[in-house]
Amino acid sequence: APKPSSAASDVYKRQLFALCDGRHALLFGGAQDHKRAFDGDLGPNTGGMGAYSPAPVFTADLVRQADERIVQPTIQKMAEEGAPYRGVLYAGLMATEDGPKVVEFNARFGDPECQVLMMRFAGDIVPYLLGCARGDVSGLPAPAFKPQTVICVVMAAKGYPDSPLEGSIIRGADQDFGPHVQVFHAGTKRRDDGQLCASGGRVLNVCAEGDDIAQARDRAYAAIRKIDWPGGFNRSDIGWRALERG
């Protein structure tokens, strides 16, 4: 599959997440997504065709700079202006010679970034979300994550993102893929005859964990090969940036 040059890859956005209570922000891991519809980062932008975590582009120094220069000042300034923010802060970042720069903020977890983060998260998310809602995360420990890599490959309906084909039959998505794979349903429904079919653009999220990005990716694509869905498609190169970095 065609791939952008390594030089171009430095402009790709990374996602850093934080849990905020209006005054404090706890970092909640990072991920790298793939926005373009087709292999080689070609085609139209989408809601996300895949993601993985941890992302090698998130060096400890980059995370520290993003926290000190972007996340904490943003939360503090919003509180000073009488608009304290509680919830998940999604910071879409670009690495530059002058450090991380903000491309966008969202007030939510990303999709499919949330799936890979939740599979790596080693704790109970509920106390953290309650802390955000109640206005105090200061007493909570820093979120802990498993060392494994998790990758998510999105299976979308043909025609996505412009005119996704709905109603096509999906077989094999409900099978047991083993302990290292989870398939999240995003746009599926049951027909009256019980068959599973597509009911949206991004339809399935095939997620797998591994000791490294290569193993996680192999497991995800092995699971995809077991799913019979002629009406769907997926990228075959999710994780290519991490693999290039070794």
PLM feature spans:
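Generic C-terminus detector
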Residues: 188-193, 197-246
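Residue-level signal for inorganic ion chemistry
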Residues: 47, 153, 216
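Single conserved hydrophobic/aromatic residue that forms the stacking wall/gate
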Residues: 1-8, 12
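Phosphate-binding core of ATP-grasp and ATP-grasp-like enzymes
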Residues: 10-56, 67-113
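Active-site "cap" helix and flanking loop/linker of ATP-utilizing ligase/carboxylase catalytic domains
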Residues: 66-89, 106-180, 191
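Short, well-ordered beta-strand elements within core beta-sheets of diverse protein domains
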Residues: 51-54, 152-154, 202-210
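A structural signal for short secondary-structure junctions
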Residues: 97, 144-147, 176-177, 196-202
